[in-house]
A protein has these predicted regions:
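Bacterial N-terminal signal peptides
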Residues: 8-17
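Surface-exposed patches in mature extracellular/periplasmic domains of secreted proteins
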Residues: 84-96, 148-154, 172-180, 231-237, ...
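Acidic/His/Gly-enriched intrinsically disordered linker/tail segments
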Residues: 152-221, 227-228, 234, 243-248
Length: 323
C-alpha cells in the first residue's frame, strides 16, 4: 500500500501512567505520514543488499522473535526484489517495524516524499513461519521501483506490486511456479470490470485497483513476449524504468513511465494496452488465456500443459533472466 490514510490505531487504555506512556511513545510512529524525525532518533541497523542499504529501526515494544530474525526476513525480501529488478530499486531505504498485537504482518505502507521509507506493522507474537509466509514486505519494496503517480493511476502502482511480488519470490526460490499460477487463476477475475465500471483510471475499487492493475501487467507481459519472440517481457520494461532513474522518490506522469518501459522492450505494448484499458472497461477472456499458457486448476494441484501454445511464455515469466 502506498501512503495509506488508514493505519492501525492502538487504543490508550487508562491503566495509569505506566500504560499511557508506552501508548504515547507508540503513537509517535503511527499516523498517515512516515515519522522521519522520530525514525532518525532510533538506533538503526544497516543491511547491505542488492547494491542498496536498508536502515532498519524498531519502534518501542517487544517481539517474541529476536530482532535479528526480523532483520533476516527483511534481507530475504530485499534479495527477491533485487533478483527481479537486477538490483534494489533505490540506493537506501528506511524500514520502521512497529509492534502490534497478535501475529503476522498486519500492514505495510511505502513512502517516497522525503526519501524512500517503509513502515511495517508486525504482530509481536509473530513466528518464523509467519515471516516465511509473508508477502507484504516484497509488495512494499516493489512499490519503491515505480515513480509516484497521480491517484487515478494508483492501479498501476498497486497492480505492478501485486503482479511482481509472487514472481520475484519464485525467481528467488521462495515460492513455486505452481503456487503463484494457481493463485492468479483464483484471484485475477477480481480485476474484471463489473456492471457500470469505467476504465482503470476511473474505477478506484479494491478489485480493479489491485487485480485490475495486475491483469494489465499479465496481459502486457504476455504481449511483450509475443512481440519480441519471448526475448523480453514486463520484467525488462520495469528494469528499464528503474535504470532511467524511476523510483518512488520521483513523481512522473504515467505517459512517461509507459514510454520508458516500452523503449526498454522495443515495443509499444504498454501504451497500447493503456489506451485500451485506461478509459474504457476491458474484459479479456481469462479462461482462454490460462488454456493458452497451459495452466489448469481442478480439484487437485495446479497442472501445466507444456504443449500449450504459450507455455514457453509461462515458463519465461517466472524464470530468472540472464544477465
Amino acid at each position: 500500500m502506498i501512503k495509506s490514510v488508514a493505519w492501525l490505531v492502538l487504543p490508550v487504555v487508562l491503566l495509569g501512567a505506566a500504560a499511557v506512556a508506552p501508548a504515547r511513545a507508540q503513537s509517535e510512529y503511527t499516523g498517515q505520514r512516515f515519522p522521519y524525525q522520530a525514525f532518525d532518533r532510533l538506533p538503526a541497523t544497516q543491511i547491505k543488499v542488492g547494491g542498496a542499504t536498508l536502515e532498519v529501526a524498531f519502534a518501542p515494544g517487544e517481539f517474541a522473535l529476536p530482532r535479528n530474525a526480523l532483520q533476516a526476513w527483511l534481507e530475504t525480501s530485499a534479495k527477491a526484489v533485487s533478483v527481479y529488478y537486477g538490483r534494489f530499486p533505490v540506493a537506501s531505504v528506511r524500514v520502521l517495524i512497529v509492534p502490534a498485537p497478535g501475529s503476522g504482518v498486519k500492514k505495510g505502507t511505502s513512502f517516497g516524499t522525503r526519501g524512500a521509507a517503509i513502515r511495517l506493522s508486525v504482530g509481536s507474537d509473530s513466528t518464523e513461519v509467519n515471516l516465511v509466509r509473508d508477502w507484504v514486505v516484497v509488495h512494499e519494496m516493489t512499490h519503491l521501483a515505480l515513480p509516484d503517480v497521480p491517484d487515478p493511476h494508483l492501479w498501476l502502482a498497486e497492480g505492478i506490486a501485486t503482479y511482481v511480488e509472487p514472481i520475484a519470490r519464485v525467481q528467488a526460490g521462495d515460492l513455486t511456479a505452481a503456487k503463484i499460477w494457481g493463485d492468479m487463476v483464483r484471484d485475477m477475475p477480481k480485476g474484471l470490470p463489473e456492471q457500470g465500471d469505467r476504465g482503470l483510471d476511473g474505477t478506484p475499487t479494491w478489485g480493479r485497483t489491485y487485480w485490475g492493475g495486475a491483469m494489465f501487467c499479465l496481459l502486457a507481459d504476455v504481449e511483450i513476449r509475443k512481440q519480441t519472440g519471448n526475448k523480453a517481457g514486463l520484467q525488462q520494461a520495469l528494469r528499464g524504468i528503474v535504470e532511467a532513474g524511476g523510483n518512488m522518490e520521483q513523481v512522473w506522469p504515467i505517459e512517461r513511465i509507459l514510454k520508458i518501459g516500452d523503449d526498454a522492450t522495443g515495443t509499444n505494448v504498454l501504451a497500447d494496452l493503456y489506451a485500451k484499458m485506461g478509459e474504457e472497461p476491458y474484459a479479456p477472456d481469462l479462461d482462454a488465456l490460462w488454456r493458452d499458457l497451459g495452466v489448469s486448476v481442478g480439484e487437485g494441484p495446479v497442472t501445466f500443459d507444456d504443449s500449450a501454445p504459450l507455455a514457453p511464455i509461462r515458463r519465461a515469466i517466472t524464470a530468472v533472466p540472464a544477465g
